[in-house]
Structure formats: C-alpha cells, structure tokens
Design a protein with these regions (language model features):
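Sec-dependent N-terminal signal peptides
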Residues: 4-15
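C-terminal, surface-exposed recognition/capping segments
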Residues: 20-23, 27-29, 33-50, 54-152
Length: 152
C-alpha cells in the first residue's frame, strides 16, 4: 500500500492535471531563462516533443546552465529540488520514462528530460537525474522522456 501511495504521489508531481495553472519561474540564471513550474502531462519521443513544443524545449546549453548555476537537492523518491542563484526553485521529478511497450520504468529513481539539441541523426541531448548524479547525456530519439518547458 505504501508503494502504491508513493507511486500516486510521484505521478501527481510529475503530471499536472488538465487545466492546472502553471507558471514560469525565474531562477536568477545568467541567461535570464525562465523554467516552467511543472512537467508537461505525458512522455514524448523527441520528434513529437519538437513538433508540439518547438522553441519552448530547452537547448542543451540551458541544461548546462541549470546544472552549473543551481544547487541540486535530492528529495527521496521525488526528484531534485533545483534552487537558483536568487533562491527561487523548481522540482524536477524522478518521473522515469515510458518504454517502447508503453510501460513506465524507473519511476521515483530516475528522471529523463529532452532538450531540442540533436546529437547526430538518431540521438538528442537531454538531462538525466538519479539520486547521486545530474548528467547531460544523449538519448535515442524514439525514447519517451519527460518535457520541461522554458521561456527565453
């Protein structure tokens, strides 16, 4: 029962409900980029994410800046609280990913986020989070990952 409740809580954090108001948060980053306060509702492959969100997807450089300029605090079974230079924060949930067969994997332990930056013809850069690491890494573009939008 505890695991079921935990999974439900993670899903609530990772997937906003329809019509929920969300805002863009100023973390005080040197670029002036604002980060949306919540993830988009679903997991997306790279092509679909690009078509649906376009220039609202962060570029690789935005993840590099976020990693470099912010303080990252792991919240057990939830993800990272990311605190900007000005003290404002966002939560990047460890929402896992959706496998090719449609199953959710790594919920509560890993988070994977697309950038708009391609790395060759079948990979794109993204942000990967686990309890002891935040990495900028390339992912296979058909993978279904989380999306966190920005405002430039």
């Amino acid at each position: 029962m505890k695991k079921l409740f935990l999974l439900y809580a993670i899903c609530l954090l990772a997937f906003p409900t329809m019509g929920q108001n969300s805002e863009y948060i100023d973390l005080g980053l040197s670029s002036g980029t604002l980060w949306k306060s919540v993830n988009e509702e679903d997991f997306y492959n790279h092509s679909t994410a690009m078509k649906k969100f376009g220039n609202q997807l962060p570029e690789k450089q935005h993840f590099v800046e976020l990693k470099k300029e912010c303080q990252w605090i792991w919240k057990d079974n939830y993800g990272y609280k990311v605190i900007g230079p000005n003290g404002n924060s966002i939560l990047l949930p460890a929402a896992g990913s959706r496998s090719f067969n449609g199953n959710l994997t790594n919920v509560g332990t890993h988070g994977f986020y697309w950038s708009s930056t391609l790395d060759g013809s079948v990979q794109a850069w993204g942000l990967g989070i686990i309890s002891n690491a935040v990495t900028i890494i390339n992912y296979y573009t058909p993978s279904c990952l989380s999306v966190r939008l920005i405002q430039k």
